[in-house]
Amino acid sequence: LETPVSVEAPKAAPKSDRQLFYELKFNNLDRGLTPEERQEWNSIYASYRGRSAITGTIIGVDPHSIYVWNPETERREKKTMYCAIVVPYRVRIVIPASEMWEAGNERPDYVLQNMVGASIDLVIIKVEREAGFAIGSRRLASRSQRYFFAHREDLHRIGSRVKCRMLAVGPRRCLVDCY
């Protein structure tokens, strides 16, 4: 006697953010935009697709609260982090504090709060097109700049001049981005 074998279709893995991004119908979403807004969204899309840096000015630093699962207490806990806000034209780009600094080189929250008005490079890491905002990473853009700087001999020899951007000024020190 043969026993029937049930064949179940394998469950499809959930789609990644990148896969969901490529499924968006941009023509429908961008239909009512002005030319300036369309240009801004196109530069955001290009940064997300190609991991290329775009430049923007920090216009503010806001605290954002989210609930995260703590495995030790087995409860949801409210966690608040500061996020830099960049608005090139109308689209809000949020940069969490965790995406501002390299691991091991984190700065206190007051340094981020003193960066308002600073011009920074960032890479878009998530696009929330329906909600009208994007999430960026200064950390990834800085990593790309460091790679470029390290592989150009004329930029890091004694006596060479480099471009710098003033990021933050405090009572005893300042933070400068050289590239």
What kind of feature is each model-predicted range?
Residues L1-Y179:
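Single-stranded RNA-binding regions, centering on S1/OB-family and related RNA-binding modules
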